[in-house]
Amino acid sequence: MKSFLIAIVIAVLLPVSAADFCAQWRLSKAGKYIIYNNLWNQNTATSGSQCTGVDKVSGSTVAWHTSYSWAGAPTQVKSYSNAALVFTKKQIKNIKTIPTTMKYSYSYSGTLIADVAYDLFTSSTASGSNEYEIMIWLAAYGGAGPISSTGKAIATVTINSNSFKLYKGPNGSTTVYSFVATKTITNFSADLLDFFTYLVKTQAFPSSQYLTTLEAGTEPFTGSNAKMTVSSYSAAVN
């Protein structure tokens, strides 16, 4: 009985799920991250499903994966399974560094339309609604494209030795900036503050904005037997 009770306590405290989770809004706490399945737009698919799981937590690093098949509405994102950092919200001007690393692989059958991207949101107050969204696309598979007012990049910029095309467009009342890598990056290491510094200098981005959300994951449009495996991910806001 004693060993049984100990096993229950361990199971309750263990931050990593033993199995994949497939429900639309399921999540799993993993160290200083929350791993979301986040099938926010699944109803646009004619068929499909997606499951996500945590593989390992080691210090400030997490390994996780997500698997899916989605059909229909090839211009519509179906989900954004991601690892979200839990952090204290700060104004951009008061942040010293936002170091991050992500190493991943992607497999699929047939044709895939998807991206792999960081997603960061800011607001004029720590608890306010989203005013700006900054996306950093490491990969754009099958012609996936970002939100854009014109369909054309407004600039090409090199940050941390990686080349990105910058797009701008509205998503409701939120202004979206998307840095799309010109070549697929599967092993990424950067200070994300450099992207904000660029926007402050060239796009009149207000440094008084609070960083409220920092996530990294994948947005599938369509795909069959697809799987993204993140072997190592870390992020911090200093």
UniProtKB/Swiss-Prot annotation:
Keyword Thylakoid tagged: no
Any one GO BP annotation for this protein: polysaccharide catabolic process
Effect noted on mutating residue 40 to A: Affects the binding to host GIP2 and relieves GIP2 inhibition of XEG1-induced sugar elevation
GO cellular component terms, A-Z: extracellular region
Entry-listed glycosylation sites: 171, 187
Gene3D superfamilies: 2.60.120.180
Alphabetized UniProt keyword annotations: Carbohydrate metabolism, Glycoprotein, Glycosidase, Hydrolase, Polysaccharide degradation, Secreted, Signal, Virulence
Main location, first listed in the record: secreted
Subcellular location: Secreted
N-terminal signal peptide: 1-19
Outcome of mutating residue 38 to A: Affects the binding to host GIP2 and relieves GIP2 inhibition of XEG1-induced sugar elevation
GO molecular function: cellulase activity
Active site per the UniProt annotation: 133, 219
Function (record text): Non-functional secreted XEG1-like protein that binds to host Nicotiana benthamiana apoplastic glucanase inhibitor protein GIP2 more tightly than does XEG1, thus it outcompetes XEG1 for GIP2 binding and frees functional XEG1 to support P.parasitica infection. With XEG1, is required to elevate apoplastic sugar during P.parasitica infection.
Subunit structure: Interacts with host apoplastic glucanase inhibitor GIP2.
Similarity field: Belongs to the glycosyl hydrolase 12 (cellulase H) family.
Name of the protein in its database record: Inactive glycoside hydrolase XLP1
